[in-house]
């Protein structure tokens, strides 16, 4: 099955942002947290290079070392940000042989970070990869490169220079996009009557974002009615269990405490619980594979109706053999 991160979605907000931004724009994302000074230090590095830069912190609370989590937050945020340089650092391999890279996207942004798959969904979200260059030219880095803080010494200064208009090819040599490290991103299986997916992120409310978009669900199940009951099958073999949820457009479509499946504000499928935690109620967490179908009772009823219908119709199969 082909790996697929997303379909490209262009947000109305992004469409209204002028391509020629009148200030350098830099966004920052990391798993550093905010207790230590790392985020402030990197903001300072940007301002030392581009004093007029507008800086936005996407998040510094990415789960520690969780590349998939960081990639998802980039995927969600980037279409709503101005065109600029987006520095992302979730880098368990810092100081190793992994490459530092800068990606130019079709929208005109630069994504700067480690070559570990972190940047790929965001790049696809912005129209796809145009060019990739390794970050090697020390002229655009801090004078001393530590072995454990490439966010400060390498990624942030490179991003700031790109935001100022330094050509990408000045940063370092080109890299074949086909050779980039891929992301361990759950694949979506679409078959008649069922959608195979997995939990990719649990938010602070206990909502569970799934691999796959609303179009995948429609392709698998056909038309879905608001309020329709769906079955969520978890596990396999003797440990398999099935949970029931409602297809809804908002939390109040179901009773307090009831679980629902809905399309979230980013176009992703999401399991939630009205005024509660879907993760706790459904006993699911990140990485859990699951299958979404219609309940067996409805399928059985539909099959019975079809059989009754067929009994009333002439059947060519009933023709006597020659």
Language-model segment annotations:
Residues 2-97:
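N-terminal glycine-/serine-/threonine-rich phosphate-binding loop
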Residues 24-27, 53-56, 84-87, 100-102, ...:
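Structural motif
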Residues 37, 41, 50, 65, ...:
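Conserved active-site and cofactor/substrate-binding residues in soluble primary-metabolism enzymes
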Residues 49-55, 69-70, 80-90, 95-153:
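Active-site histidine-anchored catalytic micro-motif
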Residues 142-225:
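Anionic-ligand-binding alpha/beta catalytic cores of soluble enzymes and soluble regulatory domains
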Residues 168-174, 241-244, 300-301:
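Flexible, glycine/charged-enriched surface loops at secondary-structure junctions
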Residues 211-283:
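A conserved acidic, glycine/proline-rich C-terminal tail/linker
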Residues 267-322:
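Generic C-terminus detector
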């Amino acid at each position: 099955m082909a790996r697929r991160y997303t379909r490209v979605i262009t947000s109305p907000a992004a469409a209204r942002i002028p391509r020629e931004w009148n200030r350098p724009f830099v966004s920052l994302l990391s798993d550093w947290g905010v207790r230590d000074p790392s985020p402030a230090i990197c903001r300072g590095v940007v301002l030392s290079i581009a004093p007029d830069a507008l800086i936005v912190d996407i998040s510094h609370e990415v789960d520690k070392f969780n590349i998939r989590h960081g990639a998802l937050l980039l995927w969600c945020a980037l279409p709503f940000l101005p065109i600029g340089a987006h520095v992302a650092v979730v880098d368990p391999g810092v100081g190793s042989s992994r490459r530092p890279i800068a990606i130019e996207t079709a929208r005109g942004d630069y994504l700067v970070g480690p070559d570990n798959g972190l940047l790929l969904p965001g790049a696809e979200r912005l129209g796809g990869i145009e060019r990739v260059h390794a970050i090697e030219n020390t002229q655009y880095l801090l004078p001393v490169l530590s072995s454990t803080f490439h966010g400060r010494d390498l990624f942030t200064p490179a991003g700031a220079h790109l935001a100022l208009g330094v050509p990408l090819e000045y940063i370092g040599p080109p890299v074949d996009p086909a050779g980039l490290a891929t992301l361990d991103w759950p694949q979506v299986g679409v078959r008649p009557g069922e959608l195979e997916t997995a939990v990719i992120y649990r938010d602070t409310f206990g909502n569970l974002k799934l691999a796959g978009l609303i179009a995948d669900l429609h392709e698998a199940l056909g038309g879905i009615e608001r309020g329709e009951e769906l079955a969520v099958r978890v596990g396999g073999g003797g440990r398999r269990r099935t949970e029931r949820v409602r297809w809804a457009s908002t939390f109040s479509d179901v009773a307090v405490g009831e679980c629902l499946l809905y399309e979230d504000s980013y176009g992703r499928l999401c399991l939630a619980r009205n005024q509660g935690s879907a993760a706790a109620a459904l006993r699911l967490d990140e990485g859990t594979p699951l299958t979404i179908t219609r309940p067996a009772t409805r399928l059985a009823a539909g099959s019975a109706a079809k059989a009754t219908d067929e009994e009333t119709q002439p059947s060519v199969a009933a023709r006597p053999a020659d």
